[in-house]
Amino acid sequence: MRLIAGVLAGFLVICEVTSTSESDRTMAYQTADTDNTQPTGAVENSIASKQFLRTDVVMNRGEERGFEALKKLLPGTKIVAKDGASFSGAFVRKMLGNNAFRNQEFKRWTRSDLDGTALRQMLGDMNKKGRTELLNRYTAFLGPKDGLVYHKPGPIV
């Protein structure tokens, strides 16, 4: 008798787990086809409203615009160009135009062990205006060291 009850309980658990996983898959497909809204009856306070669920797909790009505005408030966001691998032209111009800002950044780079080679890679195309001058000023700021070479315009090797 106990054996039959145990087998029956195990069978019910397996059936319930299977149906739950199938319903989860069905629910995932259903939410992908809808406009990603939460049904009004599912709200805890029973106020009828349309609430949008979070998804990884941005439908109206409003959330991305908010994120971009937030990034502008954070320090150092305009340092990197659109390619994400080099300094922006505005940052290079600001570094060359503002002596106090340049010294502050150079000190910060020195604390983070940024050498001339790493800076040269961040400067990207050395033929662009001001990039060679900025690299030369940074290497002069560091002072004479073994292996530190001042740059002459040309491609990165």
Swiss-Prot record:
It is found in: Secreted; Host cytoplasm; Host nucleus. GO terms for cellular component: extracellular region; host cell cytoplasm; host cell nucleus. Induction: Expression is induced during host plant infection. InterPro entries: RXLR (IPR031825). The keyword Secreted applies. A motif (RxLR-dEER) lies at residues 51-65. Residues 1-23 form the signal peptide. Keywords: Host cytoplasm, Host nucleus, Secreted, Signal, Virulence. It comes from the Eukaryota. Effector that might be involved in host plant infection. The RxLR-dEER motif acts to carry the protein into the host cell cytoplasm through binding to cell surface phosphatidylinositol-3-phosphate. Belongs to the RxLR effector family. This is RxLR effector protein PITG_04049. The lineage of its organism: Eukaryota, Sar, Stramenopiles, Oomycota, Peronosporales.
